[in-house]
A protein has these predicted regions:
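N-terminal module-boundary/linker segments of secreted carbohydrate-active enzymes
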Residues: 22-70
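Sec-dependent N-terminal signal peptides
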Residues: 4-15
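Active-site acidic/histidine clusters and adjacent loop/turn architecture
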Residues: 52-117
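Mid-length scaffold segments of soluble, non-membrane domains
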Residues: 100-101, 115-150
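Bacterial Sec-dependent signal peptides at the C-terminal "C-region" and cleavage site
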Residues: 13-24
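Catalytic cores and adjacent binding grooves of peptidoglycan-active enzymes
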Residues: 130-132, 142-218
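Extracellular/periplasmic catalytic domains that process cell-envelope and extracellular macromolecules
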Residues: 53-56, 136-142, 193
Length: 218
């Protein structure tokens, strides 16, 4: 019954067309984690733990535009609680040509967050702790997603007055008054869609700014 219901959900979500009549059925889907993807995740984005397991996660396929107007197919793993929300969001982003450069599994970067951020890769699930702490990240539960991270860095002023910037190569895009490609701004389409679907934006935090980051609190 569970697999049947999931198949119905995939059919319903993917049977939606754009306002121009383009069928999106081949580009957007939700699945339980396929065996080949699960194997790829082992020792990388997935580590043995008591918090989250395979049945809690979903594998998503989406389409997206880049800044040059080219269409790409992307994939990600997320918590099943936000799978439908992410499909709705990415369908609308695609309809309105909102640019996202890459959407690849973090496993392709050996779950190295710095590497994938430098490559401007958008991703969701990765079982890891918050940088510099022992606290589990919302990414560890598949409840957070980072969008175009190179151009939307994490920035925090430390006690000694220096700035911690992640990725380290993102200094040119820390000035949020400037306009540049792949930038997330308060009130733009990406920001609006995530907030409408119950996510919190890291760019609104007070003591630190995580402009790439949206997280969902169940």
């Amino acid at each position: 019954m569970r697999t049947t219901l999931l198949s119905i959900l995939i059919f319903w979500l993917c049977g939606i067309s754009t306002s121009q009549g383009q069928d999106l059925s081949a580009g957007f889907s939700i699945q339980e984690i396929p065996d080949n993807i699960w194997q790829k995740m082992q020792g990388k984005t997935f580590q043995p733990n008591d918090v989250i397991g395979r049945s809690d996660l979903r594998y998503l396929r989406v389409m997206h535009w880049d800044y040059d107007g080219k269409t790409h197919y992307g994939e990600m793993v997320c918590n099943r609680l936000i799978a439908q929300k992410l499909i709705r969001i990415f369908m609308e982003l695609y309809r309105q040509h909102y640019p996202i450069q890459k959407i690849r599994l973090a496993d392709e970067y050996d779950a190295d967050d710095e590497r994938q951020m430098r490559d401007n890769n958008t991703s969701c699930f990765c079982y890891r702790k918050v940088s510099g702490s022992q606290k589990l990240s919302y990414h560890a539960r598949g409840l957070a997603i980072d969008i175009n991270p190179l151009y939307n860095p994490y920035v925090k002023t430390q006690k000694d007055g220096t700035r911690l910037i992640q990725p380290k190569t993102a200094t040119p895009w820390c000035d949020r008054k400037k306009n540049f490609q792949y930038k997330i701004s308060k009130g733009d389409l990406c920001h609006k869609l995530f907030l409408q679907n119950g996510f919190v934006w890291g760019g609104s935090w007070k003591t630190q700014k995580d402009y790439q980051h949206f997280e969902f609190h169940p």
